[in-house]
Amino acid sequence: MTKPFILLVPGSFAPETIYASTIAHLRTLGFPAVALRLPTTTKRMPLPAATMAEDADVIKRSVEAVLATGQEVVVVCHSYGGTPTTQALGELGEKKGVRRVVYLSAIIPRVGESNNDAMGGKKGELAFEMTEGYMHIDATTFAPAVCNDLSWDLAYEHTLNLAHHSGASFLEPATQAGYLDIPVSYIFCEKDMVVTPEKQSGFIDVVKEATGKEVHVVKLDAGHCPNWSMPEKLGDVIAEMAGM
């Protein structure tokens, strides 16, 4: 069987480069794979900060581009990335060829909910300031919250890569729900302090209630970013899900 193309959608604040080790491992396993760059993580002065809908458009067009080559695709979305991915896959006119969506400790909004709504108006353990439409991270505080499964020095070095994210994107509601008619898997991070286990269980229930189907779940003994703490193990789990 031909292996599907894996598109990885980053979380908030996250450049595509933070998934490089996992992407490289997937390629060694024979999967074509790439992490996307979201507009909401890119400052583009004098234009305003990008919206969630703009992220969804990038995801949708990327999926369509892969499908146009005749390949099947699996979309893996991390954290905030679950919100625009849910929107993007719902907007697809043709879903044949989208083999699966994999939510990696990700937010799954109901139709009408924003990222913040889905999180109950909370932002986990994140500490940031808002300037000129962008949220900015305090890496000193952020590191132990996101990388609680790494030593503080490594966590700090990693989180220096997380610069800024559009504030507006957290407030825009989803109008589509791609999980309604695409098979769903969830990578559950048991030590996550940002999207907590309680929240992750709630998001899995959102899909169950909306579809009447069970969700395939794999648990990792990891914090919010297994792409840093266990990149190859994460790649192995994604590969397993992509082969379903």
UniProtKB/Swiss-Prot annotation:
This is Probable hydrolase R7. Transmembrane segments: none annotated. GO terms for molecular function: hydrolase activity. Induction: Expression is induced on squalestatin S1-producing YMG medium. SUPFAM superfamilies: alpha/beta-Hydrolases (SSF53474). Pathway: Secondary metabolite biosynthesis. Probable hydrolase; part of the gene cluster that mediates the biosynthesis of squalestatin S1 (SQS1, also known as zaragozic acid A), a lead compound for the treatment of hyper-cholesterolemia by targeting squalene synthase (SS). Both phenylalanine and benzoic acid are known precursors of SQS1 and so it is unsurprising that the cluster also contains genes potentially involved in benzoate production such as phenyl-alanine ammonia lysase (PAL) M7, which catalyzes the first step in the degradation of phenylalanine, or the NADP-dependent dehydrogenase M3. It comes from Phoma sp. (strain ATCC 20986 / MF5453). The lineage of its organism: Eukaryota, Fungi, Dikarya, Ascomycota, Pezizomycotina. InterPro entries: AB_hydrolase_1, AB_hydrolase_fold, Sec-Metab_Biosynth_Hydrolase.
